């Protein structure tokens, strides 16, 4: 691994803005005493992971009214259609911005970090040692917010990932 890029694409819980305002939700702990009023609409994978819903319920003492796992892409639609009140997401997901969702702070640091870092084969690095210096120029330069914006361009606006990445690198002065 080379140096991390700076963003953490970890799990998060998200709610609609109206729900966050009505219940004054800012952190996952805020759900603790009232989770029984909410429908949880997690992805199937998140629902069955110890570092997902299973462990989260224990760590935060959550007891949702109902848990209805859904396909990953459908969880946002279900949330916006009020078929669920809380969903899991990734912190760099562009759909969070598309739907104007409130991401609840993981105030107990339950979710493990998922830092992005370039991975390169040693034989490739020996053949092209300049790659390490070039790739490390991006170390700690891409925030969660920036990555979410880039993902938004791809996932919401349907833009080509390579084009979006190239535009970012040009705008930040890494390439011409």
Model-flagged regions — what are they?
Residues 1-41, 140-144:
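A conserved helix-loop-strand patch within extracytoplasmic ligand-binding domains
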Residues 1-2, 83, 95-109:
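Ligand-binding "clamshell"
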Residues 4-12, 106-116:
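Short Pro/Gly-enriched coil loops immediately N-terminal to beta-strands
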Residues 10-21, 115-128:
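A bilobed periplasmic-binding-protein/Venus flytrap-type ligand-binding module shared by bacterial periplasmic
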Residues 36-39, 57-70:
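A local structural motif
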Residues 44, 65-77:
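Short helix-initiation/N-cap motifs at beta->coil->alpha
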Residues 54-59, 72-87:
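Short helices/loops that flank or line small-molecule/ion binding pockets
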Residues 57-62, 129-176:
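An extracytoplasmic/periplasmic, membrane-proximal ligand-sensing/linker region
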């Amino acid at each position: 691994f080379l140096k991390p890029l700076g963003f953490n694409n970890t799990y998060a819980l998200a709610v609609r803005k109206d729900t966050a305002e009505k219940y004054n939700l800012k952190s996952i702990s805020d759900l603790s005493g009232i989770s029984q009023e909410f429908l949880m609409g997690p992805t199937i994978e998140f629902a069955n992971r110890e570092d997902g819903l299973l462990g989260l319920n224990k760590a935060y003492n959550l007891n949702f009214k109902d848990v209805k796992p859904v396909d990953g892409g459908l969880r946002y639609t279900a949330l916006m259609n009020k078929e669920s009140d809380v969903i899991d997401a990734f912190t760099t997901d562009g759909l969070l911005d598309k739907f104007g969702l409130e991401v609840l702070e993981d105030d107990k640091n339950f979710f493990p970090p998922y830092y992005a870092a370039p991975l390169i084969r040693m034989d490739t690095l020996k053949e092209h040692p300049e790659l390490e210096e070039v790739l490390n120029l991006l170390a700690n330069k891409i925030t969660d917010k920036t990555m979410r914006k880039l993902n938004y361009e791809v996932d919401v606006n349907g833009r080509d990932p390579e084009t979006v990445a190239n535009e970012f690198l040009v705008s930040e002065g890494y390439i011409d």
